[in-house]
Amino acid sequence: MPTTPSPLALAQGLIRCPSVTPEEGGALAYLAGLLAAAGFSVERPVFSAPGTPDVENLYARIGADGPCLLLAGHTDVVPPGEPALWRHDPFAGVVEGGELHGRGAVDMKGGIACLAAASLAFLAERGPAFGGSIAFLVTGDEEGPAVNGTVKLLAWARARGERFDHCILAEPTNPDALGDMIKIGRRGSLTATLTVLGAQGHVAYPHRAENPIPGLIRLAGALLAAPLDEGTAHFDASNLEFTTIDVGNPASNVIPAQARAVLNIRFNDLWNPASLEAELRRRLDAAAGNAVRYRLDVQPTNAVAFLTQPDAFVDLVTAAIEAETGRRPALSTTGGTSDARFIKEACPVIEFGLVGQTMHQVDERVAVADLDRLAAIFRRILDAYFPASPPPAERA
């Protein structure tokens, strides 16, 4: 059986490509070469949108019959900041003390390397006729606007007749140790600006002005007075946070003309953006009455809450993780949003990857042992998802 590259070698190769979003940096080209050499058909479509950079993406597939397992991720990374603050060059892929250092080691070039290493080893042993299909869907637009990436790549694939049965997105899901957590859903995110209107005037003549600040305090209090919900079996309670309050008034002797607050809600699957906006307006109208003039501007959002119901596929992934790590992972929907919100429109999706403690930080790094174990977990998943047929003698 031919030797296939280790997850460490693949991760180093990806990290050494400076693919700071939206730059491709050679990362997709590197991955495309590996997959093409293993027999995948590979395409690299570029998508555009007004006001956003053009972004290159990758789609690769091997096999035509049977179930299709989609393996997804992104090769773009956030900027490293000041390189002098790093122990090693953030794009050198240095191993020190059993850890691989570099931007993207955790989020998420390490995860992609493990998906690729597992797939290449699986194909080297089983060959191309393994009773199904494996597809890679990798974008260079996840850390940026997320406009010309996964959402368009999925639409492009769908228009070509591509269909997927299940997906693994290799985001760093584990809080402390490999095997801690699988993400089976994500909360939605909604941002809105609340503006209370007043009338500017001199503070010494308040009867000639209308101060919007008391009205803003009143309306903000109404939004926070009662919880939005109590949560569900798989989701925490929805949470509203004010992130800024501002009047844009540098003068201490002037009553401002308006006061503004920005809020963000991370919501569970009891809500959608329309129903959540309706609830906000209901609370605001009740508190404002005829005394407070306000405007609520809700930003469009594509981050809607979703849940992949625990089923046989989730059980298969859980069993692979437990067999390799000895830990039974929690099924969680915590944290921020991810490209899983787009993939769930194509097929059931779960997220599992590395330990996320150093993602987006200076000296981002991952234990080499975790790369090996994550690749082993993915290999177990592939073996279970595409079980080998018994030899003819055993079938008889």
UniProtKB/Swiss-Prot annotation:
Pathway assignment: Amino-acid biosynthesis; L-lysine biosynthesis via DAP pathway; LL-2,6-diaminopimelate from (S)-tetrahydrodipicolinate (succinylase route): step 3/3
SUPFAM superfamilies, sorted: Bacterial exopeptidase dimerisation domain (SSF55031), Zn-dependent exopeptidases (SSF53187)
One of the record's GO molecular function terms: zinc ion binding
Pfam families referenced in this protein's UniProt entry, alphabetically: M20_dimer, Peptidase_M20
Catalytic function, reaction form: N-succinyl-(2S,6S)-2,6-diaminopimelate + H2O = (2S,6S)-2,6-diaminopimelate + succinate
Cofactors named for this entry: Zn(2+); Co(2+)
Assembly mode: Homodimer.
Record HAMAP family: DapE
Protein name listed in UniProt: Succinyl-diaminopimelate desuccinylase
Species assigned in the record: Methylobacterium sp. (strain 4-46)
Gene, per the UniProt record: dapE
